[in-house]
Amino acid sequence: MRISLNKYKIFSNAKINIGLNVFQKESDGYHNIDSIMAPIDLSDEMDVTFYSDLGDLKIECSDKSIPTDERNILYKTYKIFFEESKKEKEKIDIILKKNIPSEAGLGGGSSNAGFFLKLLNKHYGNVYNEKELEKLAMRVGSDVPFFIKNKTARVGGKGNRVDLVENNLKDSIILIKPLDFGVSTKEAYESFDNLKEVKYADFDKIIKNLKEGNRIALESNIENSLEQGILETDTNIKMLKMTLNSVVSGKKFFMSGSGSTYYTFVTELEKSQIETRLKTFVDNVKIIICKTIN
């Protein structure tokens, strides 16, 4: 018989990449990156129940396309935490309600993992300090350490360097996620590896623009290495970008992470009009309005 010990409801938010530089593959098969990641107020919900008896992790998910067995990143998080902490495994149930789209470049899975890892640490008496938790998170996935701090940050290396930056942007963000296709991270990096020339974002300028809250200047400095590769190989992405540029002329659209989500910054005055145009003239996409969490 399962006796419930503690119940928690946690909200694990998404992120956007405000620029992403990817560098040539290292000898270990991985790429170093340089990026500004900013948390946004679009969140998954996790109801987590700890039981008093020993056992394993059980996951239920609202999105039936997401595996709930050992392939789920929450399982990896659970396994690594208990292996490292030497705590006895308790039975834990997670009911996961997905609001962050998959294959979107918004860090949904990494966010779930980061917030679950923080909850495990808290539940067991803060076994690790923040720095130690970031190192543990790195073993789960390269975007997971960012969600330990969960503040706008410059992320470097293979995701292991997370340095906070000041973000004074006041604009809203419109996310555009295609419904009938996504981009796998593997596909994105393979496309990047075949690029002959890469245009890089200037993060010194981006950091200055964020501090000043200067969206116009910021937009002129954003580049995404993975997008440049994907636009060469993925017809769906190429058509989506062309459609966005033609439907809302004069606005700049940026890919987050490895895609397939695009986003644009909007003022309060233009938000409603641009949202309406996108919903009217761009087929098979989900439109989400959000803001960065500063």
Swiss-Prot record:
The residue stretches assigned to a coiled coil in this entry are: none
Query: For this chain's UniProt record, which GO biological process terms are given?
Result: isopentenyl diphosphate biosynthetic process, methylerythritol 4-phosphate pathway; terpenoid biosynthetic process
Q: Name one GO molecular function term.
A: 4-(cytidine 5'-diphospho)-2-C-methyl-D-erythritol kinase activity
Q: What is its EC number?
A: 2.7.1.148
Residues annotated as signal peptide: none
Q: Which SUPFAM superfamilies match?
A: GHMP Kinase, C-terminal domain, Ribosomal protein S5 domain 2-like
The function of this protein is: Catalyzes the phosphorylation of the position 2 hydroxy group of 4-diphosphocytidyl-2C-methyl-D-erythritol.
**Name assigned to this protein:** 4-diphosphocytidyl-2-C-methyl-D-erythritol kinase
Name the gene behind this protein: ispE
